[in-house]
Amino acid sequence: MNLRSLFAAFYSIYLSVLGVLFKPVKPKNHLTLLVSFEENAQALIRSYKAHAESLSYEVTVLYTRHAVSLKKELEGVGSFYVNEKHPLHLLKAVLILFKSKVVITDNYFLMTSVLNRRPQTTCIQVWHANGSLKKFGLEDVTNQNRPASDISRFKKVYRSFDFVTVGSDAMADVFKKSFGIRDGQLLKTGVPLTDVYYEEHKPELKHKWPKKIILYAPTFRDYDMQSFRLPFTEEQLTNALNGEYMLLVKLHPAVLQHISASFESELIKNVSDMRLHDLLKAADILITDYSSVPFEFALLNKPIFFFTYDLEEYDQKRGLIDNYTSVIPGKACHDSEALLEEMTKKPFRAEEMKRFSDKWNMYSDGNSSEALLKFAETKMKNCAEAPA
């Protein structure tokens, strides 16, 4: 057992002790959001504020360091910043979970495992993506190198999910394999983070740059966090693309903290601190790789290109979905020249993009947050307290 697995084992034991300690706590009409991404939480908080008068419960947000940008949304709701490595933070967070009849989370949190033997609290997983091009959970290829104790711990967390929200039947199939869940656990409410793409507001960021916008939003490589590759150089933007485009780069938070050298220039800007949905709305073109961002951007029916310079390596080390190249709405381009060929010489296939979006966003209709909050309301009313 490596050091990381050993730490996780002690972490799990500590959580189990807290679970026993707080078992007598009776839940109230309270909904807790446990989040490490801002997108779903932002949508749910805004919807809650808009419909609070018709809902019987209060909301508390537990957020980690990757979701600190949520602070501006938290007025009017309870909140607590959780350092997952701080024992007292964990103690308070678990107590808040136990005081709630409904918990909604957006990621893998070991602390939800304490809810496994707590039928009076419903745990709903909304996940942080409305589609997936890479394998995760029980399907993750790195599991083959992990000790059995790790896999057992993962399953313990997945068993804490009473329900998982889905935006499509395609993603439902992914979740069933990745989390080991059944059809009866699937909530076809759509995915809250997609609601914003149905709002008819003009892109707020469009005026910031005088040129057309290419947004580059790559996923992270957990086996190489210190480097990333840009799809175009300043010279290519100037000459091959006639200086018509700005290249905006949105890096994953996990990568950003490892990148020290600046890559910015006149036509290349780092926009990693800006909200994804604002950038997607402003962008004319998206370039990505194995990220889940295309599933959101497809709702806007604009061109997507795939810069997959390390496709074979990524598939071997991290694991892509089966038939990746036939699933994506476009060609997998191994270098900048292939990207330029696709961008400058191939017409945009709007119908193909719409089919892709319809397949992966079939239940996301712009009202997913409201639908999920209404479902939580029914669980509040039907929640029976565990016997003493």
What are the language-model segments listed below?
Residues 39-52, 177-178, 186-261, 333, ...:
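Conserved catalytic-core segment of nucleotide-activated headgroup transferases in glycan assembly
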Residues 102-109, 114-116, 124-127, 274-318:
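A donor-sugar binding/catalytic signature common to diverse glycosyltransferases
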Residues 2-20, 133-135, 139-225, 253-256, ...:
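A nucleotide-sugar donor-handling region in carbohydrate enzymes
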Residues 1-91:
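N-terminal pre-catalytic "stem/leader" segment of glycosyltransferase-like enzymes
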Residues 292-360:
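Catalytic binding pocket for nucleotide-activated donors in carbohydrate/polymer assembly enzymes
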Residues 103-104, 162-168, 248, 286-287:
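A short beta-strand/loop micro-motif in the catalytic core of glycosyltransferases
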Residues 82-98, 253-295:
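Donor nucleotide-activated moiety binding/catalytic core segment of transferases
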